[in-house]
């Protein structure tokens, strides 16, 4: 059954972003699902931890075998400050799992507390991204091709974490809730081998009465061929130090394409 769900997720993702290769030369496509045995050592539940800082260490380095996609983590003063953690935690209980100690929980309306079927299309695992660029530094989560070869990141699926959704709706001691007329956006910026920007794609991630609560397709194909993509979160919800929302989100089923040799 798990294998069938994995295949279904791959087919669904490939179909959603099929236009990435239309009218082009012979292309190869892979969907990075974060499922299977090669990912098991990196899943947060293997560490018995629900908090990014308890999982992400300098030795926490994963790489997809089919595409060489990897996600280097950023540390400041010895502490995790931005990057990715593979997770399977999912819940609809914002009161219990809506603070920073459970920042690895993705929102799933169907489960009160589970470590299965929280990913896109009922899969089990996904990435939790954390970090942004601000006056305090550049801590944007980055997806990079470790072999340095440029590929097209056609798209992925995004969802809210319980932590983000709880603060967006209810606020907390460090951030107000999203008010009428305010919004939060996520951005993906592509870079070529020379470090030049290839473009930026922006999605409205949350407004007062319109928040992402399910896996939602995000088309990144306009970035073109890239060696890395940096993700950012911005918005006009602020405290005295600037943007105040938790800079967390989930992504899954990253579709990658490259020219066949």
Regions found by a protein language model. Name each.
Residues 157-159, 175-176:
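Short edge beta-strand/loop segments characteristic of extracellular beta-sandwich folds
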Residues 158-164, 232-237:
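Generic short beta-strand segments
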Residues 167-186:
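Short coil-to-beta strand junction motifs in C2/discoidin
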Residues 180-261:
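Terminal, low-complexity interaction segments
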Residues 148-155, 225-226:
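Extended extracellular/luminal ectodomain segments enriched in beta-structured repeat modules
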Residues 141-144, 219:
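Short, T/G/N/S-enriched strand-turn elements that build extracellular solenoid repeat scaffolds
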Residues 3-6, 14-41, 258-261:
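Bacterial Sec-dependent N-terminal signal peptides
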Residues 27-140, 148:
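N-terminal targeting leaders for non-cytosolic proteins
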